[in-house]
Amino acid sequence: MLDPKFLRTELEATAERLATRGFILDVDRLSKLEEKRKSLQVATEELQASRNAISKSIGQAKAKGEDVAPIMAKVGDLGAELSSKEAELKQLLEELNAIAMSVPNLPDESAPIGADENDNVEIRRWGEPKQFDFDVKDHVDLGEQHAGLDFKSAVKITGSRFIVMKGQIARMHRALTQFMLDLHTTEHGYTETYVPLLVNEDSLLGTGQLPKFGEDLFHTKPATEEGQGLSLIPTAEVPLTNLARDTIIDEDELPIKMTAHTACFRSEAGSYGRDTRGLIRQHQFDKVELVQLVKPEDSMAALESLTQHAETVLQRLGLPYRTVVLCTGDMGFGAAKTFDIEVWLPAQNTYREISSCSNMQDFQARRMQARYKAKSAKKPALLHTLNGSGLAVGRTLVAVLENYQNADGSITVPEALRPYMGGLTQIG
């Protein structure tokens, strides 16, 4: 959520910056609503002052033995008018808040301006794609060859875009998760955190999934006892970041770095027909998430380090990748700046996204009222929040299967994973 004061005082400048990400802010409507808000605010304050002044005169009139009925009637009339104006102002503020909640974050000035993914800027590559002297198989064929990826059973049990994993493929999936968690906790300084897979509406509002992206979520039925329904998490970013909601953190505790391995659930609304084969786009998938809570002046440096932490996973696994900075038109709703890491998939002969690392600056913190207290400051200030995949486990499995395949369809186990697979060097 943008700073409401900034939105009011810098409306034209805000609209211009939002336009670079393809969002058209209705300046005329907001201007009219703001003028109306000011008018109602003044009227409400004047009515309150008048009522208070007249109310004080009641005691004076009583002391003089005067008839106070006319004064009390006047106070009643003012009270009724005040209630009406307050109700009108409340409704208007709710309308302004609803608009503010639908406005995306302002892109950072360092983000390249562009319309879509074609305008993203590659900033580095690591590793060279392997040249195979045989026809490569994709991960679906490899997984089925080793009886490790069972899409048919998943369709029978649940439906499309789900998977049943078995045997050494399932073991490799688990090994990847353990390897990622160990790397981030022992070398990168993150605290492993276990979080709920179901979250409430306040949490989804806090991180920006609601109100705009409700259709992308899986919702439970309304809970009678709780008074509201819960939703399955689309990413561990939601529960991890919301740990800071409605809290004031001491400056000495920052930065806070958390990691969690969870299943994630997405309806993939709007993705009909895209990546229908294999593990690339699933309704349920595992991910190791990285979240950082930092002081504002540290957030851009934190974005660089968080991105490097995700890249290190691919480097240790020996998987070629490239890193791109997203242009303004391709960034997520709450992001001020984003780096995407794309891993090389031989069967597709291209790089595919495996991690998205974003600096949300104070966008989420304002929604959540997540603050910190500096020793030199009189008042708490908003935190900056960052998140990224470290990594998406299923897509990493895809990359390992395809990049480490041999001519006979066997899979060489990357050295980094062998300690997690009982020393196994090859599948098949």
Curated annotation (Swiss-Prot):
GO terms for molecular function: ATP binding; serine-tRNA ligase activity. It comes from the Bacteria. InterPro entries: aa-tRNA-synt_IIb, aa-tRNA-synth_II, aa-tRNA-synth_II/BPL/LPL, Ser-tRNA-ligase_type_1, Ser-tRNA-synth_1_N, SerRS_1_N_sf, SerRS_core, tRNA-bd_arm. Pathway: Aminoacyl-tRNA biosynthesis; selenocysteinyl-tRNA(Sec) biosynthesis; L-seryl-tRNA(Sec) from L-serine and tRNA(Sec): step 1/1. The keyword Nucleotide-binding applies. GO terms for biological process: selenocysteine biosynthetic process; seryl-tRNA aminoacylation. CDD domains: SerRS_core. L-serine binds at residues 235-237, 289, 389. Its main location: cytoplasm. Keywords: Aminoacyl-tRNA synthetase, ATP-binding, Cytoplasm, Ligase, Nucleotide-binding, Protein biosynthesis. It catalyses: tRNA(Ser) + L-serine + ATP = L-seryl-tRNA(Ser) + AMP + diphosphate + H(+); tRNA(Sec) + L-serine + ATP = L-seryl-tRNA(Sec) + AMP + diphosphate + H(+). Its EC number is 6.1.1.11. ATP binds at residues 266-268, 353-356. It is found in: Cytoplasm. GO terms for cellular component: cytoplasm. Catalyzes the attachment of serine to tRNA(Ser). Is also able to aminoacylate tRNA(Sec) with serine, to form the misacylated tRNA L-seryl-tRNA(Sec), which will be further converted into selenocysteinyl-tRNA(Sec). Belongs to the class-II aminoacyl-tRNA synthetase family. Type-1 seryl-tRNA synthetase subfamily. Consists of two distinct domains, a catalytic core and a N-terminal extension that is involved in tRNA binding. Homodimer. The tRNA molecule binds across the dimer. This is Serine--tRNA ligase. It comes from Shewanella loihica (strain ATCC BAA-1088 / PV-4).
